[in-house]
Swiss-Prot record:
It is found in: Cell inner membrane. It is a single-pass membrane protein. Changing K142R: In strain: 1479. The gene is tolA. Changing V48A: In strain: 1479. Keywords: Cell cycle, Cell division, Cell inner membrane, Cell membrane, Membrane, Repeat, Transmembrane, Transmembrane helix. The chain crosses the membrane at residues 9-29. This is Tol-Pal system protein TolA. It comes from Haemophilus influenzae (strain ATCC 51907 / DSM 11121 / KW20 / Rd). Residues 72-139, 167-176, 184-217 have a biased composition (Basic and acidic residues).
Amino acid sequence: MQNNRQKKGINAFAISILLHFILFGLLILSSLYHTVEIMGGGEGEGDVIGAVIVDTGTAAQEWGRIQQQKKGQADKQKRPEPVVEEKPPEPNQEEIKHQQEVQRQEELKRQQEQQRQQEIKKQQEQARQEALEKQKQAEEAKAKQAAEAAKLKADAEAKRLAAAAKQAEEEAKAKAAEIAAQKAKQEAEAKAKLEAEAKAKAVAEAKAKAEAEAKAKAAAEAKAKADAEAKAATEAKRKADQASLDDFLNGGDIGGGSASKGGNTNKGGTQGSGAALGSGDGGKVGDQYAGVIKKEIQRRFLKDPNFAGKVCRIKIQLGRDGTILGYQKISGSDDICSAALSAVARTKKVPAAPSDEIYEKYKSPIIDFDIR
């Protein structure tokens, strides 16, 4: 019970102190907001504005009293005393009105301050928006300027590249033209060289042909002349051989004997020596040629008494001009055949046959060698 009383006493004291603080604060605030009319000319005319004048001395005394009460209350708390319930003082109507007026003024001031702060915020927001707009415009201008600079740079680069491409194209065309001209020059030089070579070759061929034709003509003429001379010589030789044959036939024999010994004459004999050339009709030219062959060879036949009673048969091969192409032993003793073969080898050539017919008949005659 006593504890409850002590708590109630403490609460009442705390409320009293709080009210005193509020009152003291209101007094100070009222002294800040009072107005004093300045009377003009000392006449005392004009409207009178009510004001509350606070005596600072009284306020100080009140403040000292409150402090004493707080100190006394603290002392009471240190030494417990019986708690006496105090009846709270009745509120003063004037103070209440004054307090309400102060509250109204504070609310008005708060609203004005709030309005001022809102206006400041509005102005700040407007300034911020204007700054943002300016910044945006500056950035847009900067971006536009950068874009224009980039465009100018791109245009300049494009122009530079176009000029470089054009220059490269012109250089390429010039280079191509130079290469084409060089190629044309080389082709012309090569063509001229080929034409010159062809012309020189044609001239050389024509010259060679002319020389060849001249040589051929000269050779043909020389051959014709040689043929004519050879023919004339052959004819002369034939005539000479024929004359010799005629002379031989007019005064010689065939087979190595005389007419009285069985040799044939141009007027007719009946017997001749040798197997192939030793017999025949004495009135035929072929037999006469056979006698000429035998006489021509036997002129070189060296006779020896030891050959008596011996016969050597030799077969010879003649060319158309009477050249002895070859010979061989058919039969006979070695001693007489050796002399016969030696005679044939030394003869080498006999008069040519007067005709092809006689040559075909006597181109391989067999001659008998003996010492009769």
